[in-house]
Amino acid sequence: MITIQKYVRAQTLEEAWQLNQNKRNRILGGMLWLRLGKGSVNTAIDLCDLGLNTIEETEDQFSIGAMATLRDLELHEGLNAYSGGAVAAAVKDIVGVQFRNMATVGGSIWGRFGFSDVLTVFLAMDAYVQLYKGGIVPLEQFAKMKKDNDILVRLILKKTPCKIVYTSVRNQRTDFPVLACAVAYMNGCYRASVGARPARAMLFCSEKSEGFASFIAENAPTEGNLRGSAAYRTHLIKVLVERAMKELGGM
């Protein structure tokens, strides 16, 4: 169980950032993963007063606040029209509606969890994160970065024309994925992200569809855990990428 000594609702990002420089302080998202931890938090920092719970759409991008929920992603008409329903498909099996009403986009992306459907689907698209001090960083680069004491302000999705398919395999519907996969065709290039390896999602790109699935299966490191073996995950990579590419019309 985690214990919190003090709770602060930050009134500015600067205040939140200053508080977050203390290693014993933590920023709260939806509090769904953090509460499962152990130890003591000196100050819990809540960003709920900073207006980061919206999804704003312009002609060329979506700006998704860190405190927007997974349910907001699931129901946003513009976002799902752009992605052909791939974003909704990525989050629909994450536990249940009550959970998705509380889990935040910022927490899901910042955590860079190996099991993250959210990271997997956005990694295949033209996505960026805005960090308070670090500025705007491509999501592919952010996914490889070590965690620090910066603050994720929002996720930015450019409306670069693309077709995308999301698919996953689960042992049961609301469980973590055994393997997650998103494949997009954008700017004449296939972009495939593979998550739940069970490590962080990885992105692969190729101009050719032939042999792409086999290449990813051969080069994406996998490991075994209670949900599946490394060999099973490697097999799933090839199968899921091929299925997604057929749906895109690339095979």
Specify the residue positions occupied by each region the protein language model found.
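C-terminal structural segment of proteins
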Residues: 1-251
